[in-house]
Swiss-Prot record:
One cellular component term from this protein's GO annotations in UniProt: nucleus
The protein, known as: Agamous-like MADS-box protein AGL90
Encoding gene, per UniProt annotation: AGL90
Subunit structure: Interacts with AGL62.
Annotated ranges, domain MADS-box: 1-59
Keyword annotations of the record: Coiled coil, DNA-binding, Nucleus, Transcription, Transcription regulation
Its job: Probable transcription factor.
TM regions (residue ranges): none
GO biological process: positive regulation of transcription by RNA polymerase II
UniProt cross-references to Pfam families, sorted A to Z: SRF-TF
SMART domains attached to this UniProt entry: MADS
Amino acid sequence: MKKVKLSLIANERSRKTSFMKRKNGIFKKLHELSTLCGVQACALIYSPFIPVPESWPSREGAKKVASKFLEMPRTARTRKMMDQETHLMERITKAKEQLKNLAAENRELQVRRFMFDCVEGKMSQYRYDAKDLQDLLSCMNLYLDQLNGRIESIKENGESLLSSVSPFPTRIGVDEIGDESFSDSPIHSTTRVVDTPNATNPHVLAGDMTPFLDADANANMNQVQYQAPNNLFNQIQREFYNINLNLNLNLNSNQYLNQQQSFMNPMVEQHMNHVGGRESIPFVDRNYYNYNQLPAVDLASTSYMPSTTDVYDPYINNNL
């Protein structure tokens, strides 16, 4: 809604229309006030647009309220009474008080900036007098008092604060990170070492032989540390060799007898490092377990092409 400019309406017809509308609005508000709040109120309006002064709620009601008001003491009547001059003087007083407060805030900011610039060696940039130096000294003393109070507080509570902090554990496993880590209670750390069994580890091992737990084992992994045995490579190669000896190639013995024999011999010989003394297939791209590496087969002596699905995986074929 557009704000109305408080000035005399130049057009007489518009002024009369506005008068009638606002007069009815005042009478409506007085009726709501007296009905909702249970107070006695009256209104008396003089206007050049009507020959007789108009009163609310009626002439008798207005006289009754006016008589009751005149019976009150003068101090009680004039306590909240205000004319135009009194209203303007009150507004001027409030504005002067606000100006005084803003001037004090600006002066404090100027002195604080002057102090920080003096610390940085920029004192020569200012033109100051004795009053400025006195204000600067007061500001510096205020900051020094705050610093000294802070130092005394740290000296008094320093030992108790340091003693309440629990020391860090010297050796921990996998830390459990959760909401409990931010509680006030001290943290108790335990480490549980689990030795890897002689059988093949069911968890997947990365290229650097660091074990990773699967999703099922993650449910209770609070500070568990796994240690692999020193002979893990020999155990894997031995398991690889034993399973390859019992591998069923599902070939027709009548049709592929020679091909099966020529395919099995190189595979067995390549992984008999601890039996036959031959070298294993060299590692390619950190492939420590010979994944997806075909055996060296003499294609000139056989017509059978080995399938890539027959390559042994120690963890996939463990459940066969």
